[in-house]
């Protein structure tokens, strides 16, 4: 493998199985995790970009667990490993909706993984952000809750 398609150090802590089973699943996978998406990026935009590398089998958009709205990630599954490797080489680090997107291997989509794992329903990384990011809903969700005006007092 070349460096651009090697496995990263990230491992899904919720993977059901041993570390060696996870490694094997990642090495054989045709599924990619795509991160740092804008909350406004559409499935059609993702399909247009990733289909340049091969036939996309399915795209699963990441959703806020409670609101069921996009929360900045998705899974893209190809029919072959070679197509997925091409996407790792050519799409990782490119711009989509004016954001540098991250592409990484995923062991394979399982129902339920499309939901954010943060306390507020989105991604954990968006809970604690202190910077303002218009493409990811403004300030971090926990910070936004602290600074939101109290509308109960009339």
Swiss-Prot record:
UniProt keyword terms in alphabetical order: mRNA processing, mRNA splicing, Nucleus, RNA-binding, RNA-mediated gene silencing
Annotated gene: Cbp20
Q: How does it assemble?
A: Component of the nuclear cap-binding complex (CBC), a heterodimer composed of Cbp80 and Cbp20 that interacts with m7GpppG-capped RNA. Interacts with Ars2.
Its lineage reads: Eukaryota, Metazoa, Ecdysozoa, Arthropoda, Hexapoda
RRM domain boundaries:
30-108
Region annotation Disordered: where it falls in the sequence? 1-23
Where does the protein end up?
Nucleus
MF terms from GO for this chain are: RNA cap binding
| A Gene Ontology BP annotation from the UniProt entry | mRNA cis splicing, via spliceosome
Q: Which GO CC terms are listed, alphabetically?
A: nuclear cap binding complex; nucleus; presynaptic cytosol
Does RNA-binding show up as a keyword for this record? yes
* Superkingdom as given in the UniProt entry: Eukaryota
Specify the protein name: Nuclear cap-binding protein subunit 2
What family, per the record?
Belongs to the RRM NCBP2 family.
Instruction: Please tell me whether the keyword Nucleus is annotated for this protein.
Output: yes
What role is this protein assigned?
Answer: Component of the cap-binding complex (CBC), which binds co-transcriptionally to the 5' cap of pre-mRNAs and is involved in various processes such as pre-mRNA splicing and RNA-mediated gene silencing (RNAi). The CBC complex is involved in miRNA-mediated RNA interference via its interaction with Ars2 and is required for primary microRNAs (miRNAs) processing. Also involved in innate immunity via the short interfering RNAs (siRNAs) processing machinery by restricting the viral RNA production.
Q: Give the Basic and acidic residues compositional bias ranges.
A: 9-23
Tell me what organism the protein belongs to. Answer: Drosophila grimshawi
Q: Which InterPro entries match?
A: NCBP2 (IPR027157), NCBP2_RRM (IPR034148), Nucleotide-bd_a/b_plait_sf (IPR012677), RBD_domain_sf (IPR035979), RRM_dom (IPR000504)
Q: Where along the chain is mRNA bound? A: 10, 33, 102-106, 113-117, 123-124
CDD domains per record:
RRM_NCBP2
